[in-house]
């Protein structure tokens, strides 16, 4: 295992790569034309640091992926209706280099709900990925108690593993 990284990629056959998540977004990128794969872990902290944007830009610049032929698959994660944060998080999200307002729902109690999956999808679109090649998850880890782990929900350790390899 590689510690303290939120993204890994390979262009080599028979090497399994992946990321562990609970409520955070796991993103699996695959470009079969290269071939190459990448796994990204992005909680709200990774999102405000634009991990997906930076990773995809790097992969495109180094010709590891082609945005027109790359597919993106999202793991189950905490979704828009469940991811409540404070205004200090909103202030950080507003520093991203695109319009984030569609991904924020303000509440009267100085809290807001954010669409972490949506923010990461927008980063993929901003880098030229085709919307038809992006596959969001409909599973909300906070609500799918029988099928998903949610640290926010049960405060227990449990994780999903988003992984892949090139045959």
Regions found by a protein language model. Give the residues of each.
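Active-site microenvironment for binding and transforming phosphate-containing groups
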Residues: 1-167
């Amino acid at each position: 295992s590689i510690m303290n990284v939120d993204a890994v990629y390979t262009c080599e056959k028979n090497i399994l790569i992946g990321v562990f998540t609970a409520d955070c977004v796991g993103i699996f990128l695959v470009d079969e034309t290269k071939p190459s794969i990448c796994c990204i872990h992005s909680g709200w902290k990774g999102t405000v640091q634009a991990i997906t944007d930076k990773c995809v830009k790097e992969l495109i610049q180094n010709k590891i992926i082609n945005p027109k032929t790359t597919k993106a698959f999202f793991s189950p994660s905490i979704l828009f209706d469940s991811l409540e944060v404070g205004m200090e998080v909103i202030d950080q999200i507003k520093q991203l280099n695109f319009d984030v307002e569609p991904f924020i729902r303000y509440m009267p109690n100085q809290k807001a709900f954010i669409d972490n999956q949506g923010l990461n999808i927008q980063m993929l679109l901003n880098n030229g990925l085709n919307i038809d090649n992006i596959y969001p998850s409909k599973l909300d880890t906070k609500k799918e108690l029988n099928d998903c782990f949610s640290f926010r929900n049960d405060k227990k350790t449990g994780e999903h593993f988003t992984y892949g390899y090139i045959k």
